[in-house]
Amino acid sequence: MKILALDTATEACSAALCIEGELANNGITTKYQLAPREHSRLILQMIDELLSQAGVTVSELDAIAFGRGPGSFMGLRIAAGVVQGIAFAHDIPVIPVSTLKAIAQRAYELTESENVLAAIDARMDEVYWAKYTLTGQQWVLDGEEQVISPDKLHLAETLAGQGNKWVGAGTGWASYADRLLPDSGFSLLARLEDCFPSAEVIAKLAIDELKAGNTVPAAEAIPVYLRNDVAKKPKPVVL
């Protein structure tokens, strides 16, 4: 099994190649860089380097996974365009992965907490938000992913008595921690303000999805913006 994964949804730009059966890092090699506004320049280079170093051609890939959002409008378009271009040209199935779920998975790897409050700074005084719990081997979303003002979540009330089991993760906590959890005596198990989604984590999440047959065709590699004021569709980038 060979899966190419990429993510350009936030300030972080990354690509990863998962080759099942290899021992190093669970068979995953990755390129990662915090580089706001440089994703379009970096992502194709990262992909080329990963494939070249592994001696893998695009036609050998079993699937392409990507961070489908939410996140930066431009970043999501870049990832979707690259994925569509490769998938269309080589008839490769696609696995869209939630960036908020990827943050939850990364937070779990860092803290072993199975309860994660994932928040990405959405600008415009809002956060992209999701409440995830790991049940068995699957992340379960409580409610729905949403874009919302931090003041409207009322976490101190809804999570009363549960603070010691929840981890807050993502850039939303760096920007709005005082509003997500105003001074109320409520505290989290941990707060990971610089926890970004990454292609490495997306590749890990994509393995089970591919085995279960949860893929979509290239035409359905669509970003999830959560905001409704996005009109243009990403243009495929052909490799």
What are these regions (language model features)?
Residues 1-68, 196:
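N-terminal beta-alpha supersecondary unit
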Residues 9-12, 125, 219-220:
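Short, basic and Ser/Thr-rich N-terminal targeting/leader segments
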Residues 21-26, 38, 93-196, 231:
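Surface "functional belts" at beta-alpha junctions
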Residues 34-42, 73-77, 81, 98, ...:
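Residues at secondary-structure transition points
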Residues 50-54, 89, 107, 202-210:
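Stable alpha-helical structural segments in soluble proteins, enriched in small hydrophobic residues
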Residues 65-99:
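DPxDG-like acidic metal-binding loop motif
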Residues 190-239:
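Acyltransferase
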